[in-house]
Amino acid sequence: IALLLLIKNKKIGLSIFSNIVIITILNQLLKRILRRPRPTEFRIVEETGYSFPSGHSMVSMAFYGYLIYLIYRYIKNKYIKWSLIVLLSILICLIGISRIYLGVHYTSDVLGGFLLSISYLVVYISLIKKILSEE
């Protein structure tokens, strides 16, 4: 998606790419600082590394949440706009649920990842909005 938008609109493409890079770095820093062990009781798959915050939850919320913002801002057709927003919101929730179901995260890891990403997105969007407005 970022590559396609980079070709069509460089600012939007770069904003998507930088969003993913920043949230991934932030997630890794928080994991190394907090060092919460993963659940050991029930695992369908084996994961390594620390548990909090959930990387999948943080990255999915930051990536799809930012796409939701872009869709809301740029897509004019209300049916398409709201259909995409609902579908992406469901996808974010399903990714979080899957991490708990697979036994690789506690519920608090997923919810914490979502909340950290939402907080990050508020700041990121407020900063990037100024850059995108300079089109």
Predicted feature descriptions by range:
Residues 1-50, 66-73, 82-86:
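Hydrophobic alpha-helical bundle signature of multipass membrane enzymes
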Residues 40-135:
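Membrane-embedded catalytic cores of phosphoryl/pyrophosphoryl-handling enzymes
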